[in-house]
């Protein structure tokens, strides 16, 4: 058997924050579904218009909360199902890696960043009619999670379409390329916010690099001497001499 199959990504557990995010998205979907089919409006707006990201409403009315609330809205049950499956599969792994609080912060950061990125692209390049269409879904945040997965588990294999083994880092790069090309060529004709996906990946990758990958610089107030002492401490070892006593060996300082 191909050794790559020994490195395939395992099915992760359903972790606490990921589970709660899924529950929240499902609950919001059904509330929106019921209210929409009953024709219920709030101050003349349907729930998707209030909580989805509508560029014209953000620009004209200052409804900035939409940059966060749009994440939990979904337009169709298949849209919801696909996003939640991906959130469970990749999100649980990243939650285990970052911890609950950091994962929740990261999820919201990527979602809001994706919304801001897509909003900016719409203002700069879209026609006026496009600005009135709500952007909804957790996909931007989920693409940020994919970026984190591709960084933290770069060498791990998993089956693309349940058939083709591919390293995570290559899969993430491929997805980024597909979204970029599709976003430029589609001109929004497929009703998918490709630039929200790209924005989520970009924000997520930058954050992971700065927060976890880039070597940390000196702490505030540290002198050069303190920095050197910390470096030396990391090299310090204890050995036992032939008399059975602990003996210090390594760099010394005073």
What are these regions (language model features)?
Residues 14-135, 181-205, 209:
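N-terminal TM1-TM2 helical hairpin plus the immediately adjacent luminal interfacial "cap"
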Residues 84-91, 144-148, 175-178:
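Membrane-cytosol interface at the C-terminal ends of transmembrane alpha helices
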Residues 1-17, 24-26, 179-254:
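C-terminal transmembrane module of polytopic alpha-helical membrane proteins
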Residues 4-8, 87-95, 154-160:
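C-terminal ends of transmembrane helices
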Residues 96, 152-164, 214-218:
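Alpha-helical transmembrane bundle and helix-membrane interface signal
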Residues 131-152, 168, 196:
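Membrane-interface micro-motifs in multi-pass membrane enzymes
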Residues 32-35, 87, 143-154:
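Hydrophobic, membrane-facing alpha-helical anchors
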Residues 102-109, 137-139, 163-170:
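Cytoplasmic-side transmembrane-helix entry/capping segments in multi-pass membrane proteins
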């Amino acid at each position: 058997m191909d050794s790559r199959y020994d490195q395939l990504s395992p099915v992760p557990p359903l972790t606490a924050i990921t589970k709660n995010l899924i529950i929240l998205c499902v609950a919001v979907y059904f509330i929106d579904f019921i209210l929409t089919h009953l024709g219920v409006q709030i101050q003349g707006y349907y729930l998707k218009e209030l909580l989805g990201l509508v560029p014209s409403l953000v620009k004209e009315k200052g409804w900035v909360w939409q940059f966060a609330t749009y994440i939990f809205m979904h337009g169709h049950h298949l849209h919801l199902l696909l996003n939640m499956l991906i959130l469970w599969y990749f999100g649980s792994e990243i939650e285990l890696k970052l911890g609950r609080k950091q994962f929740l912060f990261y999820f919201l950061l990527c979602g809001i960043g994706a919304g801001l990125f897509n909003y900016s692209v719409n203002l700069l390049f879209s026609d006026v009619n496009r600005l009135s269409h709500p952007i909804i879904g957790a996909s931007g945040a989920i693409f940020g999670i994919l970026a984190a997965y591709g960084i933290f588990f770069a060498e791990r294999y998993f089956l693309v379409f349940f058939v083709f083994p591919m390293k995570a880092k290559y899969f993430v790069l491929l997805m980024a390329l597909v979204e970029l090309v599709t976003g430029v060529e589609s001109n929004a004709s497929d009703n998918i916010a490709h630039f929200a996906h790209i924005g989520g990946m970009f924000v997520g990758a930058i954050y992971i690099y700065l927060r976890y990958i880039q070597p940390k610089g000196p702490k505030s107030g540290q002198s050069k001497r303190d920095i050197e002492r910390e470096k030396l401490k990391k090299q310090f070892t204890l050995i036992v001499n032939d008399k059975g006593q602990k003996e210090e060996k390594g760099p010394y300082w005073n």
